[in-house]
Swiss-Prot record:
General remark: The operon is cryptic under classical laboratory conditions, but is functional when constitutively expressed.
Phylogenetic lineage: Bacteria, Pseudomonadati, Pseudomonadota, Gammaproteobacteria, Enterobacterales
Organism: Escherichia coli (strain K12)
Induction note: Expression is negatively regulated by H-NS and subjected to cAMP receptor protein (CRP)-mediated catabolite repression.
UniProt keyword list: Chaperone, Fimbrium biogenesis, Immunoglobulin domain, Periplasm, Signal
Name of this protein: Uncharacterized fimbrial chaperone YcbF
PROSITE patterns reported in the protein's UniProt record: PILI_CHAPERONE (PS00635)
Spans through the membrane: none
GO BP of this protein: cell wall organization; chaperone-mediated protein folding
Gene: ycbF
């Protein structure tokens, strides 16, 4: 009986720990999961909401992408700015983060450009019991979208071409839009960190190197953070 109560107590403690962590991570809610910056706009706004009972200091910045497989590396500074870089959100309040264009004329006009929007939140209250509260950082995809691009960005994933070669599978994206892959599987095996396929480019992968038949299935994430219909293909 004692062992049963001990196991129950441990289970309750574990659940409560998860709930506390969830509340802490949900202290600041960002109004979106990905963002589109149309080239005909001078700025876009993002709503930040503090749902917790403590104040948070928000630090935001825009960088070139580094963390998504298939992303195009660049050492050129991002010609976009997050303002203000620091925002204090008191309990139960909202704030607005503005993304501004600075030198957008250096960006391609025939395709999208991908950036990272990094938003870190730090509890701004006093340090208690000599403990330090660390920042929680979230990174969002930010797409710069030039005017007049042909085609429908919501349908771009349907034009993605998959071709086998001696190195694996080559992905070809003929559209001017980024294709953000998700739920990709090869012969029924799910793949992780499948990343993106940049516009008007090819991406080589090591998938399907074996001689055996190769069946691929995938979805894409659209402008609104939703999932596309599932696509499947047998690769000879």
């Amino acid at each position: 009986m004692t062992n049963t109560w001990n196991r129950l107590a441990l289970l309750i403690f574990a659940v409560l720990s998860l709930l506390v962590a969830g509340e802490l991570q949900a202290g600041v809610v960002v109004g979106g999961t990905r963002f589109i910056f149309p080239a005909d706009r001078e700025s876009i706004s993002i709503l930040l909401t503090n749902t917790s009972q403590e104040s948070w200091l928000i630090n935001s910045k825009i960088n070139r992408p580094t963390r998504w497989a298939g992303g195009e590396a660049s050492t050129v500074p991002a010609p976009l700015l997050a303002a203000p870089p620091l925002i204090l959100l008191k309990p139960g309040t909202t704030g607005t983060l503005r993304l501004l264009r600075t030198e957008s004329d250096i960006l391609p006009v025939d395709r999208e450009t991908l950036f990272e929007l990094s938003i870190a939140s730090v509890p701004s209250g006093k340090v208690e019991n000599q403990s330090v509260k660390v920042a929680m950082r979230s990174v969002f995809k930010l797409f710069w979208r030039p005017e007049g691009l042909p085609g429908d960005p919501l349908e771009a994933y349907q034009q993605l071409r998959w071709t086998r070669n001696s190195q694996g599978v080559q992905l070809t994206n003929p559209t001017p839009y980024y294709i953000n892959l998700i739920q990709v599987s090869v012969n029924g095996k799910a793949l992780s960190n499948v990343g993106v396929v940049p516009p008007k480019s090819q991406r080589q992968t090591s998938w399907c190197q074996a001689i055996a038949p190769c069946h691929v299935a995938w979805r894409a994430i659209n402008d609104y953070g939703g999932l596309s219909a599932k696509k499947e293909q047998n690769l000879p």
